[in-house]
Structure formats: C-alpha cells, structure tokens
Amino acid sequence: MMKRLLIANRGEIACRIIRTAKRTGIQSVAVFSDADAGALHVRMADAAVHIGPSAVSESYLRGDAIIAAALESGADAIHPGFGFLSENAQFAKAVIDAGLIWVGPDPASIEAMGLKDAAKTLMAEAGVPVTPGYMGADQSPDTLAAAAGEIGYPVLIKAIAGGGGKGMRKVETGAEFASALQSCQREAKGAFGDDRVLLEKYVTRPRHIEVQVFGDKHGNVVHLFERDCSLQRRHQKVIEEAPAPGMDEATRAAICEAAVKAAHAVDYVGAGTIEFIADASGGLRADRIWFMEMNTRLQVEHPVTEAITGVDLVEWQLRIASGETLPKSQEQLSFSGWAMEARLYAEDPAHAFMPSTGTLEIFELPDGVRVETGVEAGDAITPFYDPMIAKLIVHGPTRAIAAKRLSRLELHVFVKVSDHAHGGAFVHHRL
C-alpha cells in the first residue's frame, strides 16, 4: 500500500480524498496556488506544497510542478481527483515515469477514450451499442452536411475533444447546419485546440444514464450499478441520483453488461464511468440506450453510488493503484435504497447566475446529510475556479423519500458571499 499520497487537485474533491487517506493510514500532501494558500484542503493535509500563481494554467495544470512537489515532499503516489489533469494521458505517463504510483487508469486507456470519435469506433468494434451518427475523418462542410441529412434532423454537432458542455450544437434543419457547424468549430478550436466534430442523432426525450465501473491490474472488472444525471443546466449536471428511475432489471443487466464490456475493451484499471444516452420516449429500453463516452476518472457524483452500495470508491482507487485485487466480486455487490446529490454553487441568481466572489460570510448546512465541501465560513471564494462550493447527498429507502429529504434542505441551507467591490450577493440553493 502507498505511504504518502499527493492530491493534484483542490476544493471538495481534495478534501474528500484526504479524509479517506487519513482513515486508511496514508499521509496526505496538498498542493496549492497563491489564491488557495489558506484553503481547507491545505489545512486538512499532513503537508502542503505551493505550486504557482492563482491561474490554473500556472498552477493546477502544471504537471511538471505537481510531480516536482510530489518528489520534494516524499510522496510515493499522486491522485488527480477530477478535472484539471485527471484525464491527461501525458501527465499520467510522466507520473509513472517519475517512479510514482498513478492513482488512475493506464495512460493508454485514457488516450483511447479521450477522443469521442475514436472511442465510439472502438466501442462499436467491442459490441457496445453506439448512437447513430457520423464519426468520419472527412471534415469538409459538404460531407458533414450530407451525413446530417442521412442521420435525419434534429442532429447534435459535438466537438471530438469536447467536454463540460462546450463544443455542442443542436441543429433542427438543414438550413441551420452550416452556421451551427462554424460556430461549434470555432468554440471547439478555442476551448480544446481541435475543431474536429462528430455528428449524432439528437434524442428528443433524452435520459443521461451512466454506469460506474472498476477494474484492477489483474484483469477483473465489475460495475457498481447506474446513476441518472438527466437534470442538467447548460449541459452540466445539477442533480444526480442512483439508481436510475424506471430502470427494470433486464435493462439494468443489459446496460451494466455493456459498461463492463467497454471497460474490458481498453483493459481498464481503476474507477471509470461509462456514459450512455437513452431515448426515454417509450420508457427505458435496452435497445434504445447508446454509448456516449467514457470518463476515465472519478466522477463528481460518485457519492450517490457510495450511498447505495456502501463502498468507498476512493479507498478502492487507492487499493487498486497499489496492486490489490478488487475488494468485491460482482456477485458480492448490491445496492439498497435511493440516493440523490445536489450541487451548491456560489452564484448570484439576480445576475444571470454569475459566480459570486468574496468572503463566505455565512455557510450553514443541515445536520444528518452528507456534505462534501472544500470551504468553511470565513474562507474566500475567488474568481479563479469553479463556483461549486459543496455537494449535498441524501439517502432513503425509496426515491420519494430521498427526494423529500433533498427538497427539505432548501429550508436549512444558508449561504452568503460578500463581494466587497459589488455589494452583497446571496445564494439560496433551491431544489
């Protein structure tokens, strides 16, 4: 087992990893930027190393600085968390080449699933159902327009290297296609440095279903059932739940089997999520659920899976990265009850939900609910990072009870962020 773990991240996920490390007897090392010098993850860790200025490009995205911090602090392993460098195959390889344990999948697996067109081709070859669409190398406007006509409108244009809701355009008719394509390509080039796109049939009544998978270094893969992340805002998840409502056992078996097959296709090691899109116009059916992409890291919404299975996914990550076999076989895994997670953002609803910055003057959360956060009252909310400040997770015997518990939180969550330059901004988390 590793002895000293550096967490190449910040905020709530860094704090969450540190807690599991402490519980399992592993020392933790935090990294921090100028803006995060007094952050909660720095205060919680056994040691902390400064890695650069506040901008992520000069700190949390500096793989060389992070590896140097690990070596300087005596860490023998690096956990990337999610976001930042967590799905960067070159960083993963550099960590391994430096003689450190990489808490994540093999760089080749990250690379294989990193480009959406290649990933879909690989999945189709492995027998995993994929969304009808175009993933060809010919990116000429005429070829793409012709492919869209063959798929049938509406279609979705997606950046091959996309993510986080960027580089996506829904197109209703052929007359709109050319301008939508140009807009999508411009955004993709600016955000990812790659303007290539793929086309998918747009599902008019979509459900976003994802399956948690885990693989070890001995060729074993299991699934930990599904999550539903259909409630989104600007293509980003807002409320997640597990299991998925309306999922019968036959459909669950089919989608989970497809997810395990996908993981085996890339010799997957560690925590991963296979994302599917379902056409729910006639209910959830196995023949109307298609592979969308694979996230080769821990997901933001992993706590809902932990709540229904009783498994600490971060502990599994640490054990598997250390060379252990999966702690449980598929037959030993089961779930009970229902879990829901809501994300709490420091945003100002009076100003188009723009991020609120300043001092977190009030941060009162209810007892009896799992809270994952990277801040405490008195901490600074800066403009440099994602405005998500906490996740609230509830569990109940049924979906109705879990939803009721989540909705009641509205009366017990009080957050005030004071922006001294622009006056006070109140954020009330409404469920």
List PLM regions with ranges.
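N-terminal beta-alpha lobe that positions the nucleotide/phosphoryl donor
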Residues: M1-I274, A278-H302
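Short, hydrophobic beta-strand segments
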Residues: M168, E240, E341, M388-V394
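Extended active-site and interfacial segments that coordinate phosphate-rich ligands
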Residues: S183, K217-M247, T296-G323, S356-T373, ...
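Glycine-rich, charged/polar anion/phosphate-binding loops
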Residues: C184-Q185, V197-L198, H208-V211, A259-K261, ...
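Active-site "cap" helix and flanking loop/linker of ATP-utilizing ligase/carboxylase catalytic domains
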Residues: G246-F276, N295-P349, L431
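Glycine-rich active-site loop/lid that clamps phosphate-bearing ligands
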Residues: L326, E331-Y385
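Short, well-ordered alpha-helical segments
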Residues: L392-E410
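A short N-terminal helical cap/helix-turn-helix that marks the beginning
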Residues: R408-E410, F414-L431
